Design a protein with these regions (language model features):
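Active-site neighborhoods and metal-handling regions in enzymes and metal-associated proteins
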Residues: 1-257
């Protein structure tokens, strides 16, 4: 294993976890998407990191924000978050030549939130459970298909659908590297890439309450939404593959394998 790479990614991951923890805590009714983006930029700079997403050609923000039917790559706007919104924050930190990537989805609520029993709590719990079940399969000797199978099983047993054309990925010197890490199994596990010690990957649960189909919005080349208008969820962590099992490089304080 490249110990220097791992140390640098551990440092970048620690920063990203701290930043996302703060961002999630600030998601309240009345805040705007762009305010969250600006706060993310400030927090990363204070920790001497850089925005990983701003290194993507053509993208000019520190976070992607997914509100309700937005699946991924939502551009932060002046939109005001309101009670009941389902909001995902995807963020990346670049430090000392290496990227880390992380996402979390939460419900916007005040202390007085009153909504019908719409199963959003269950929906978010299933997604996070699926991500961690998949992460537990991320150990040397297993294959990408073991991760995919675990993810798909939890999500579909919960009654939801895994998005097919958006996947997790390797991460390191580049934000997106090989191998692809789908949240579903296509074919046989034995035909998927072998997981080896030292690999660093981003495992993502990208899933919908409704059907799996997604489309680009007509007004930009980034935002992807559910085709049927259903709520979407996104959870992501950057992982190091070791002989002993997966190590979380990005994490919240409440994360536990």
């Amino acid at each position: 294993m490249d110990l220097q790479k791992i140390k640098k990614m551990q440092q970048a991951g620690k920063i990203l976890g701290e930043v996302l923890e703060i961002l999630v805590s600030r998601i309240k009714p009345g805040i705007t998407e762009i305010q969250i983006d600006q706060l993310a930029e400030k927090l990363i700079k204070e920790r001497r990191g850089e925005s990983g997403f701003k290194k993507v050609p053509g993208y000019h923000h520190t976070i992607c924000i997914s509100c309700n039917d937005v699946v991924v790559h939502g551009i932060p706007t002046e939109r005001v978050l309101k009670d009941g919104d389902v909001v995902g924050i995807d963020c990346g930190v670049y430090l000392n030549g290496y990227h880390t990537d992380m996402a979390e989805t939460v419900r916007v609520k005040s202390s007085e939130l009153k909504v019908q029993n719409d199963n959003i709590g269950k929906f978010l719990k299933i997604g996070k459970t699926a991500m961690f079940e998949a992460i537990r399969q991320a150990k040397a000797g297993n294959r990408v298909g073991d991760i995919s199978c675990a993810m798909q099983g939890v999500i579909e047993e919960g009654g939801y659908s895994v998005v097919r054309n958006l996947v997790g990925h390797g991460v390191g010197k580049n934000l997106h590297e090989e191998p692809e890490i789908p949240g579903y199994l296509a074919g046989k596990i034995k035909n998927t890439p072998l997981l080896k010690p030292g690999m660093t990957i981003a495992i993502e649960a990208i899933y919908n309450m409704g059907k799996k189909e997604v489309v680009y919005t007509e007004d930009d080349d980034w935002t992807i939404v559910t085709e049927d208008g259903s709520i979407s969820g996104l959870f992501e962590r950057t992982i190091l593959i070791t002989e002993k099992g997966p190590e979380l490089l990005t994490y919240l304080k409440t994360d536990a394998l």
